[in-house]
Structures are given as C-alpha cells and as structure tokens.
C-alpha cells in the first residue's frame, strides 16, 4: 500500500492549533519585515539556554571577590591619605626652605635651622654662579686667543651674512640676513602695540556716545535694583564706577544678600582665628616669662646660699633687698677690758642652717643661766649717707620701734660665767656703769639704753619678738 495514499488520523483540534500557530508565525514575519523597512530594528530574541558545567562557579568565589574589592578600596584610601600627608609635608618643607614661616615662635619647634639653611644655600648659589662666570670668562678668553689672526672668510651663502639694524626702541641689533625680514615684522607689530593705549582707545568715542553708554549702564543697574526686594542699602550699591582706591583695609562685599552674609561669616571666622592665635601667642610668652623668672629666682637662691657660705651675706642683702631691712648683727667689736678682775669670754658659734643673728640652742643647754652681755647696734653708714627722698615711707616703721631700738646695738661680752669671790653679784650679772650710762660723749653719736638677759632662753625669745 502506498504511504502517500495512507490516510492520516488527525483530529480537528490539532488542525486548529496548527492553523493558529501558522497564522502567528506569518504575523510575526510581517511585523519584522515592516520594522526593517521603516529602519527600526526589533529586540533580539532571548534564548534560554541551560547553564553548562563550565559556567558554574565554585562556592564562595563571589564572596572572596567582594572582600578583595573592599580591601582594595581601603588600601586605595590609605594610600591616598598617605599621599596627601606627604604632599602637605613637602609643601611645608618647601615653604620653610624659602623662609615663609607661619609664626616666628613656630620656628623654635623644629630641630632643623631653616634660616641657616637658606643662608648656606644662597652662599652656595652665589659661589657656584661666580665659579661659572669665571669659567665662562676663561673659556671666552681661550677662544679669543685661539682665533687666527687672519681675516674671517665670508660665508658661502649670502643669506647667512651678518647684518646690523636698529629696532623701534633705538637699540642696535645684529642678525643674519635671512632672519632680518621676520625681525623687522615683529618690531613693527611691537611698535603698533606700544602706541595703542587704553587712553587713546577712549578718545575714539565721542563725549555723547560715552554718556549714552553710561546712561544705559545706569538704567540696567536701576532695573536690577527694582527687581531686588526692599532692604538695607550698602556702600557697594551706590558706589557705581568710583575711581577712588579705598586701600587694603577695605573689603568689597557682594551685592547678593546670601553671598554677602557668607562673606561676612567667613570674615568673622578669620577674625576669631586671628584673635585666638594672638591669645595663644601671648599665653606662650607669659609661660616663657614665668619659666625665666623661676630660673632667675633659683639662681638668686643659689647665689645667696653661696654668699652665706662665703661670709658675704650682708653685702648681697644690701644690694638685692628693697625696703626696710631686718635687724642683723654687724661686726662684733673687740671686748672692752674689765676693770674689776679677769673675766672669761663666752664665744657663741652660729650655725649656718639657722636664722642669722640667733644662735642655735642645744637640747642640754635649755634652762641654763649664762652671763651673756647685751646687744648694742649702731646705725649703718650706708643708711646715714642715703638721701631722705629715697628712703622708705615712714609708715613701714610704725610697728618696728623695738626693731630700730635694737638695731643700734652691738654685742659685747663684759661678764664671766661665774663671778669672782671679791666681786659683787650685781657686778657679775649686770652691765658696768660705763656701759649703762645713757649720756653719750660729746664726740660720739648717741647710744640707746642697753638690755640685759639672765638666761639664754630670755635672749632668744627677745630676738624672736624683735625679728
């Protein structure tokens, strides 16, 4: 049986589906053809392909790639910051090498002496320039010496011949003949540019035309002023084309309100920064002054200590202290000879670590009775020679009457520790009549009455009250 004549078992629904699919394909073909004719290309068809085993990635590859990208970004940021820091340091170093310091006090913070480096660099440049000039002069002399004495032969090409000419400024020039036309053209252009000035350009306009231009400019400014909202009138609004120069202290603010406020804020911020820097500078100066004064005070203390050890304490105090001096014992006079009988001298040694003029008391000497003499001080010659105009005010000595009384006394030792059998007790403990006499000699200055002490404790308590 022939296959072509064999009937096909096809249902009606399948035939309808086939016709519908055929019709849809025909319509798609017609649409594509129309789009091609009109010049519009349709979207390419997307083909859904199954991913192959080669396109499949390993687990965690994308995460590692993201981490690497983040790490590269962080490294790039760190590198950019380091580059910015290095550029800032390079600019700062370049400024310092040129001598442009931010502040004079900042110069002391650095270990490098940039001022000396600038001086050395200039000296080196001057030396190298002088050496180079001397070398050039030597080479020029050598070339002149090596030139032949004969005449220089003329050039083979006449265009290479040297010619002299005078430019528009009256200067004598020398060039090759082939370059002469170009140089003359340049000179002509330069001469024309020099003689055309802004003043000459203004003269090209008549007075009426200039007034008309000014009127038009004024009208434009008035229109802009009408468009702006009502507000305060500033100097820049009425200045117009003023030719007066207002100096470096004048700042031209903008006419726009927002821009003007921004400029004023910036100017205020700069003023505050300047004030803060000035205050910091003053504080630094005060700290340095305080440190210097503390050092000087330490040096004075050391000097006083050395002078006390060397026995020149009184001279240093007279030179340093201003005002009323505390009572201090002066040079001990020679003891007067006792008329009644021989007496034992009691020498009191002063410790260097105690107050001057007050002897040190040992623990086993407290409460003992000694026949010490009395203090008698006389007025210092320096104070006597002093001009009353330069003396301290009298109010300083209101509560120091006893001090002045005791300052005119000197220490003497008239009595022994124990009296002789033939001597009266009042003579051994009391002063002699010649010492207690309040009537001074006609030639000697008046002396104050004496003060006697029975015990060492009485004497110390008295001098504590006095000093």
Curated annotation (Swiss-Prot):
Probably involved in neuronal development. Residues 40-77, 124-162, 299-363, 378-453 are annotated as: Disordered. The gene is CCDC174. It comes from the Eukaryota. This is Coiled-coil domain-containing protein 174. InterPro entries: CCDC174-like (IPR025066). The modification Phosphoserine is found at residue 197. Residues 63-99, 267-309 form a coiled coil. It comes from Homo sapiens. One of its GO terms (cellular component) is nucleus. Widely expressed. Residues 425-437 have a biased composition (Polar residues). Keywords: Coiled coil, Nucleus, Phosphoprotein.
